[in-house]
UniProtKB/Swiss-Prot annotation:
Residues 45-52, 119-131, 216-235, 290-309 are cytoplasmic. Glycans are attached at residues 3, 87. This is Olfactory receptor 14A16. CDD domains: 7tmA_OR14-like. PROSITE patterns: G_PROTEIN_RECEP_F1_1 (PS00237), G_PROTEIN_RECEP_F1_2 (PS50262). The gene is OR14A16.
C-alpha cells in the first residue's frame, strides 16, 4: 500500500499575502457568506412553514438551499478565519473534509438542478399530467438520488486524491483545498487514475448541463405559444434564473479541465468563486426576487403569521 503522505498540513495561499488585501478579502467573503446564510435559511424556513409552498418546485428549492449552505460553509468560514488571523494552514484531515464536502455538495447540486429543470419542463409542457408525474414519492426519490450521487462522486475523488503522496511542497495555490491544485503539488508519478476520475466526472456533469439546456429549449418553445403575456413573463422569470445558476456552476468545468500549475494563478481563485460562492449567494435572490408566493410568505413570516399546517 502506497504511503499516503508525509505532509501533515497544507498552506492555503489564497488571493494575496498582503495585509490590506487579506482584510479586504475577509470583509468581502464575510458579507457574501452572511448574505448566503440569511437567504438560504429564510428559504428553508418559508418553504417548511408555509403549507401553500408544499409543492414539488419548493421542495426541490428547499433541498437546493440546504446544499447551498453546505457548499459555501465548506470554504468561506475557513478562508475568512485564515485571512483574519494571518494563518493559512489547514490540517491534512481538514483538507480531506473540504474536498469531500465540496464535491458532494457541488455534484449533488448540479444533479438536483437537472431534476428541477425536468420539473419545470413537466409543469409548463405537460401541465395536465404534472401531479401524476411529480407526485411526492417521486420528488423524494429524485432528491435522495441527487444527494447519494454527490456522496458517491465525493468518495471516489477524495479516496483517489488522498491515496497520492504529498512529500514536497505543501502550498496549495487556492483559498480552499481543491483537487486540481492538490494534484499539482503531488509527488506521485502515476496520476492517471485520478485524472480519469476527473474526466468521467466532467463528462457526467456535462451530460447534466446538456439535459438542462435541451429541457429549457422545449420549455421556451412552449412558452412562446402561451397567448398571455403575463403567463410568458411568469415562465421566463422561473426558468431564466435557473439557467443563470447552472452557468455559474458550469465554471467548475474550466477549473477542472484547466491544467493546474504549482505557480500561483489569481485566475484559478476567481473561477472558483463563481462555482463555490456565487450560486449559494444568488440562488435565494433570483428564486425569490420575482416570486410572488415567496414574497407573500416572507411578509407573513415577518409579521409572525406564518405557521405550518
Amino acid at each position: 500500500m502506497a504511503n499516503l503522505t508525509i505532509v501533515t498540513e497544507f498552506i492555503l495561499m489564497g488571493f494575496s499575502t498582503n495585509k490590506n488585501m487579506c482584510i479586504l478579502h475577509s470583509i468581502l467573503f464575510l458579507l457574501i457568506y452572511l448574505c448566503a446564510l440569511m437567504g438560504n435559511v429564510l428559504i428553508i424556513m418559508i418553504t417548511t412553514l408555509d403549507h401553500h409552498l408544499h409543492t414539488p418546485v419548493y421542495f426541490f428549492l428547499k433541498n437546493l438551499s440546504f446544499l447551498d449552505l453546505c457548499l459555501i460553509s465548506v470554504t468561506a468560514p475557513k478562508s475568512i478565519a485564515n485571512s483574519l488571523i494571518h494563518n493559512n494552514s489547514i490540517s491534512f484531515l481538514g483538507c480531506v473534509s473540504q474536498v469531500f464536502l465540496l464535491l458532494s455538495s457541488a455534484s449533488a447540486e448540479l444533479l438536483l438542478l437537472t431534476v428541477m429543470s425536468f420539473d419545470r419542463y413537466t409543469a409548463i409542457c405537460h401541465p395536465l399530467h404534472y401531479d401524476v408525474i411529480m407526485d411526492r414519492s417521486t420528488c423524494v426519490q429524485r432528491a435522495t438520488v441527487s444527494w447519494l450521487y454527490g456522496g458517491l462522486i465525493a468518495v471516489m475523488h477524495t479516496a483517489g486524491t488522498f491515496s497520492l503522496s504529498y512529500c514536497g511542497s505543501n502550498m496549495v495555490h487556492q483559498f480552499f483545498c481543491d483537487i486540481p491544485q492538490l494534484l499539482a503539488i503531488s509527488c506521485s508519478e502515476n496520476l492517471i487514475r485520478e485524472i480519469a476520475l476527473i474526466l468521467i466526472n466532467v463528462v457526467l456533469d456535462f451530460c447534466c448541463f446538456i439535459v438542462i439546456i435541451i429541457t429549457y429549449v422545449h420549455v421556451f418553445s412552449t412558452v412562446k405559444k402561451i397567448p398571455s403575456t403575463e403567463g410568458q413573463s411568469k415562465a421566463y422569470s422561473i426558468c431564466l434564473p435557473h439557467l443563470l445558476v447552472v452557468l455559474f456552476l458550469s465554471t467548475g468545468f474550466i477549473a477542472y479541465l484547466k491544467p493546474a500549475s504549482e505557480s500561483p494563478s489569481i485566475l484559478d481563485a476567481v473561477i472558483s468563486v463563481f462555482y463555490t460562492m456565487l450560486p449559494p449567494t444568488f440562488n435565494p435572490i433570483i428564486y425569490s426576487l420575482r416570486n410572488k408566493a415567496i414574497k407573500v410568505a416572507l411578509g407573513m413570516l415577518i409579521k409572525g403569521k406564518l405557521t405550518k399546517k
